[in-house]
Regions:
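Short, glycine-/small-residue-rich phosphate/pyrophosphate-handling segment
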Residues: 29, 91, 95-140, 148-153
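N-terminal beta1-alpha1-beta2 submodule of the flavodoxin-like/Rossmannoid cofactor-binding fold
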Residues: 1-81, 85-86, 144-155, 159-162, ...
Length: 179
């Protein structure tokens, strides 16, 4: 039995001056401290969409973390394009969210993404890591100013994601998921 799972961390903003790489960098650091996961960072600013490479990387993943800002009460257009460029690669796999933004911390974007992933037959994880006022929540080195709370939230999300990744990988192997 394989005890590790493949996690794709998708950085959803492509804007100049974006904060996503800071948030994603911290989260990837948390994930890499674990021995139950391998991490592939897919930064949409550096990834052509659509592409065979993107499809292959999403297809190879057992689980996903979407790192998303909230722009105008929603998630970024390039993230929607990336998600919609594929279909079967998302099915019967868990998706977690790390969001950031102003007062809402990106949670409105996350709630919209939950509906999109439900339509793609993916399973979204209830727990979310969220940073309101994100620019003030990290120091100049990309470390959360309240590391205990942030690291605890990341740990809970990663624990739940691992459970679902293993359960759904086993289910997909035993009973291939239909359309």
């Amino acid at each position: 039995m394989t005890t590790t799972y493949a996690l794709a961390v998708i950085v959803g903003s492509v804007r100049a001056g974006r904060f996503g790489p800071v948030v994603a960098g911290w989260f990837v650091g948390q994930a890499k401290q674990r021995d139950d996961v391998t991490v592939d960072v897919i930064d949409l600013a550096d990834t052509p969409i659509p592409s065979a490479d993107f499809a292959s990387r999403i297809g190879a993943a057992d689980a996903f973390i979407i790192v998303t800002p909230e722009y105008n009460h929603g998630y970024p257009g390039p993230l929607k394009t990336a998600i919609d460029s594929l279909g079967p690669q998302w099915r019967a796999k868990p998706v977690g969210f790390v969001s950031y933004g102003g007062l809402s911390g990106g949670l409105r974007a996350v709630e919209q993404l939950r509906a999109v992933f439900a339509e793609l037959h993916a399973v979204t994880i209830r727990e979310t890591v969220s940073f309101h006022g994100a620019h003030e929540r990290f120091d100049e080195h990309g470390v959360p100013r309240d590391p205990e709370a942030a690291n605890t939230a990341a740990g809970v999300l990663l624990d739940q994601l691992a459970w679902w990744a293993h359960a759904l990988r086993h289910a997909r192997a035993a009973h291939p998921y239909g359309t």
